[in-house]
Every structure is written in structure tokens, then in C-alpha cells.
From Swiss-Prot:
InterPro entries: Alkanesulphonate_mOase_FMN-dep, Luciferase-like_dom, Luciferase-like_sf, SsuD_RutA_monooxygenase
Domain of life: Bacteria
Catalytic activity, EC: 1.14.14.5
Record organism: Burkholderia pseudomallei (strain 1710b)
Family as reported in the entry's similarity comment: Belongs to the SsuD family.
Task performed by this protein: Catalyzes the desulfonation of aliphatic sulfonates.
Gene responsible for this protein: ssuD
Top EC group: oxidoreductase
GO terms for biological process, alphabetical: alkanesulfonate catabolic process
Protein name: Alkanesulfonate monooxygenase
Pfam family, one: Bac_luciferase
Membrane-crossing residue ranges in chain numbering: none
Keywords: Flavoprotein, FMN, Monooxygenase, Oxidoreductase
Gene3D superfamilies reported for this sequence: Luciferase-like domain
GO molecular function: alkanesulfonate monooxygenase activity
Length: 385
């Protein structure tokens, strides 16, 4: 089981929908979260993309020297940048990080934002552009440096003599990750993608998506891995966890929720539509927002994209993760508020249950975790409870 964390380049806070308890989205904080994820034993981090956050490539590049083993899941944007430029960026990053790059293919589901960036295309056309883009991008990274270049004549994008002089460390190219819930998205996944990502829907819905993509990929002679994107609120007791879930949305008012839901409703993203359907745009009771045992839809009231959280004590969180893993999920991309503190909580409380230990760094005999020395003489004992 692989566990990733998240770099909150769109800001961080103790509460949703208010400036109260907010933290500056600056390099010092991004570095703190990245170093914590690296030293705690997370396998990688996701960096978000879009106008609501700092540029993922610039931030990820700045974090390479601050980390040792952490992988970076960074977005390429078909239709917003050329496949040639994106291929060179990916190869350089992979070389400078010694093979620590993972690629998140983001077609985009907010037509207003995309038009603001200069892309005027409907939903299915955007996925057709993505298909052309990935044919060229993969060819450039996999083979163009070994021959005279690649040619591709697509419906929307073409290349003639495309060549990449500096190959990536990971061959044939850094692994491709991708999420999308529409039939057009599933077709892209089956044709091109190494790991398909689902947002945190109930297990039955995730299982259905996995089955469809597996069947499509098998028909093309391919196998695909699967991951899931979730928030997490883990505490020593379930009562504490649910209390903090309620606290996270305690500053939300009806107007803030309504404005967020109106913005989401204008998108043509099938995944966003499915997220919104889980809570109906209304702030309800815990029972109404707990859409499956320990799966809470409160985050999606005002946050776009991943809108559900696993909430509970360590054993409950681990049980839900194993339930998803039984469906074929290999990678969990998690986040929590505030991201620095929650990264420690999850690693300390849940890693021993799902990864076989807490801090997975190679360390000397006196490296922790062991807590503060007792009486200036003794290392503290392990819990007897």
C-alpha cells in the first residue's frame, strides 16, 4: 500500500470557508509540509493545479533539494501547453530529481477557467485533445532521443520531427496518473494511463469505475493500477475525530456554501457532479454527511475536486483503507487540515496499521521515534495499552 500526502499550494487553514485560522501559502510552509512527508515515510506528494493555487512545476522544482526520497505528482495540462514543452519539462525534472517525478494528466473540468487560459473547447473535445497530446508526449519521451524524431498527425495536435535530446531517468517515461469519471475519460485511461485515480466515492461506486476501466484496458492489452484521493481526519478516538470534522466546517454559513455550489454547478466535470451529489449542496448533520461508514462529505461543501474525508480512530481508518485496497486500490493520496499537523497524526496513528511501521526512514540506532527522555536518563517505554 502506497500513501501520498498533499502540498497545499492553494492555502491551508484550521477551518473551511473563512480566513480565521488561515496560514500563508508560501515557500516556507510548503517546504515544512514536504520535509515532513519525506521524513515521516510518505511515498510521494500531490501538488494541485489551476488558477486557485501556485504553479505546481515551480513549487515542486523548488522542493527537490529539500527532500531526499519523496516523489512529486505534478500536472501536465493538455490544451494549455504543448506536448513538446511539457515533455522537456518532465524530462528535466526527472533528471534533476533522479527519477522522482510522477505525471498527473489534468484535462480540466472548469470551462470558465479554461477559457480564461485560452482554451475554448467542449468536454469531449478536451479529451480528444488529451488523446493527441499523450500520443506525442509519450513518443517524445520514450523514443525520440534514440531516432530522428517522431511524427504524429492528430485531429487536434500534430508533430513533425519532434525530438527530445535529454531522456528521462524513468523509462520509457515518468508514470502517467489520471482521474476522470466520464466515458471519454475512461477511454483515455485505458489507452494511455499507468495509474487511474478516483475521488473518494463509496466503495461500490469506486468498484464500478475500476471494473469499467479494467475491462477497457484489457481490450487494449493493457493493465492499469488504481489509486484514490481522500482527505483524512484521524484521532485517537472516533469521538475526537467527529468533533474535529464538525469543527472544520463550523465557520461555514449558508451563503458561502451556496456560492461554492453555484460555481461547481457551472463546471462540466462528471467527477465534480458526482462529488456534489454526495451531499446535495446542503450542510446537514453528521448522519446526513456520513455517506458510508467513516466516509464524510463535509469537505465538498466548499472545496472543489476531492470532497470526502475518512473520519475516525486509527483502526477505523485502516479498515476503510483495506476495504478500498480489496477493490484494487494500491495508492492513497491523502490530505487533512491543517496539512502539517495532520501529516504527523496520520503517520503516527495509521502507518503502523497499514505500512508496518511509523517513520520508515533508514536511521541510526538512537533515531526516533521514541519521545522525550524520562528523568534525563531513560527512553520512554512503548505503550502498554
Amino acid at each position: 500500500m502506497n500513501v501520498f500526502w498533499f502540498i497545499p499550494t492553494h492555502g491551508d487553514s484550521r477551518y473551511l470557508g473563512t480566513a480565521e485560522g488561515a496560514r500563508a501559502a508560501d515557500y516556507d510552509y510548503f517546504r515544512q509540509v514536504a520535509v515532513a512527508a519525506d521524513t515521516l515515510g510518505y511515498d510521494g506528494v500531490l501538488l494541485p493545479t489551476g488558477r486557485s493555487c501556485e504553479d505546481a512545476w515551480v513549487v515542486a522544482s523548488s522542493l527537490i533539494p529539500a527532500t531526499k526520497r519523496l516523489k512529486f505528482l505534478v500536472a501536465i495540462r493538455p490544451g494549455l501547453s504543448s506536448p513538446g514543452l511539457s515533455a522537456r519539462m518532465a524530462s528535466t525534472f526527472d533528471r534533476l530529481s533522479d527519477g522522482r517525478l510522477l505525471i498527473n494528466v489534468v484535462t480540466g473540468g472548469d470551462s470558465a477557467e479554461l477559457e480564461g487560459d485560452g482554451l475554448f473547447a467542449d468536454h469531449d473535445t478536451r479529451y480528444a485533445i488529451t488523446d493527441d497530446f499523450l500520443h506525442i508526449w509519450r513518443g517524445l519521451l520514450a523514443e525520440s532521443h534514440e531516432n530522428g524524431g517522431i511524427d504524429f498527425d492528430g485531429e487536434h495536435l500534430s508533430a513533425k520531427g519532434g525530438k527530445l535530446l535529454y531522456p528521462p531517468v524513468q523509462r520509457p517515461h515518468p508514470p502517467l496518473w489520471f482521474g476522470g469519471s466520464s466515458p471519454a475519460a475512461h477511454a483515455i485511461a485505458a489507452d494511455h494511463i499507468d495509474t487511474y485515480l478516483s475521488w473518494g466515492e463509496p466503495p461500490a461506486a469506486v468498484e464500478k469505475k475500476i471494473a469499467d476501466i479494467r475491462a477497457r484496458a484489457a481490450a487494449r492489452g493493457r493493465e492499469i493500477k488504481f489509486g484514490i484521493r481522500l482527505h483524512v481526519i484521524v484521532r485517537e478516538t472516533q469521538e475526537e475525530a467527529w468533533r474535529d470534522a464538525d469543527r472544520l466546517i463550523s465557520r461555514l454559513d449558508d451563503d458561502t456554501i451556496a456560492r461554492a455550489q453555484q460555481a461547481f454547478a457551472k463546471m462540466d466535470s462528471e467527477g465534480q457532479r458526482r462529488m456534489a451529489a454526495l451531499h446535495g449542496g446542503k450542510r446537514g448533520s453528521r448522519q446526513e454527511l456520513e455517506i458510508y461508514p467513516n466516509l464524510w462529505a463535509g469537505v465538498g461543501l466548499v472545496r472543489g475536486g476531492a470532497g470526502t474525508a475518512l473520519v475516525g480512530n486509527p483502526e477505523q481508518i485502516a479498515a476503510r483503507m483495506r476495504e478500498y485496497a480489496a477493490l484494487g486500490i494500491e495508492t492513497f493520496i491523502l490530505s487533512g487540515y491543517p496539512h502539517l499537523e495532520e501529516s504527523y497524526r496520520f503517520a503516527e496513528l495509521v502507518f503502523p496499521l497499514v505500512k508496518g511501521g511509523g517513520n520508515t526512514r533508514r536511521a541510526g540506532p538512537l533515531s526516533g521515534p521514541f519521545g522525550e527522555v524520562v528523568g534525563n536518563q531513560y527512553l520512554p517505554k512503548a505503550s502498554q495499552s
